[in-house]
Amino acid sequence: IKCTLSKDCYSPCKKETGCPRAKCINRNCKCYGCS
């Protein structure tokens, strides 16, 4: 998932992985906080 800001990742991460938390690192979303 491409991103510029960490908040760009929140919806896609939740939608695709169910993970509630996300960070944008090197223009790529890192999803975490998954159960």
UniProtKB/Swiss-Prot annotation:
Q: Which family does it belong to?
A: Belongs to the short scorpion toxin superfamily. Potassium channel inhibitor family. Alpha-KTx 06 subfamily.
Disulphide linkage map: 3-24, 9-29, 13-31, 19-34
Q: What name goes with this protein? A: Potassium channel toxin alpha-KTx 6.15
The record's GO molecular-function terms, alphabetically, read: potassium channel inhibitor activity; toxin activity
| Localization in the cell | Secreted
What GO biological process terms are annotated to this protein in UniProt? envenomation resulting in negative regulation of voltage-gated potassium channel activity in another organism
Its source organism is Hemiscorpius lepturus (Scorpion)
Keyword Disulfide bond set for record:
yes
Q: Where is this site: Aromatic residue of the functional dyad?
A: 32
| InterPro entries per UniProt | Scorpion_toxin-like_sf, Scorpion_toxinS_K_inh
Relate the protein's function as given in its record. Answer: Blocks voltage-gated potassium channels rKv1.1/KCNA1 (IC(50)=13 nM), rKv1.2/KCNA2 (IC(50)=16 nM) and rKv1.3/KCNA3 (IC(50)=2 nM).
